[in-house]
Amino acid sequence: MKILVAGKMKNKKISLSYRMFILSMIKKIISDFDESYFEEMFFYEGKKTKKTKPFTFSVFFKDYKINRDFVDVEGEVKIVISTPDIKLNMVLFNGFMKMKEYGDFEKTSVRIEKERKVEENEAIFKTLSPIFIKDTNNKALEIEDENYNKELNYFANLSLKSFRGYGLKDELVFTPLKMKKVVVKEEISGFKEKTNKKYIYFNSYSGVFHLRGDKDDLNLLKELGIGVRRNSGFGSIDLI
């Protein structure tokens, strides 16, 4: 299911690291609605867990201009959250319904949209947020790299296994159709202290691609997202 949240920025701007702002909002909503569920999802034995979470999201702006550290937003801000988890869907929908504002974001509407189904073992998708793939050395992979499909399969297998207890039923075959490189600039807690750099850059890709694999896998991945940092606003996809 997809949850569509619309709103506006009261001060007409949002940090360039808006994905982190939206993730913080999502975590706050889950925590306020069900603290034990939040602890189960984001912590293990009192410590933050790196375990993948069953959701992804994308953000869209109307009438905006990107500056060095901020995005000036005159129009609507739309957040699209996707998850195959029924409980999480309920928690997020009810939480957003109760929420009036978060920081400078003022909510105007919330609605649920049914997912379209993949009917065969292949489909053409579009990205709603950029896909980020890295190798075993944490190096971002170019889409032309011979290991791109291998690593995409690796991360898809992890997210499926985390959600349903087992991974891919069949290998995925990713074919770019009309993809372009997108460099995403993020300000992440702890990164500046370690590197003395304010921003980290993610080389990712947006556009249209063909994906072949098991039909059930494709339907779940459409809701879970693909690649790395899905829970931080990357890898959200939909049927074209």
Per-region residue spans from a language model:
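RNA-interacting cores
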Residues: 1-240
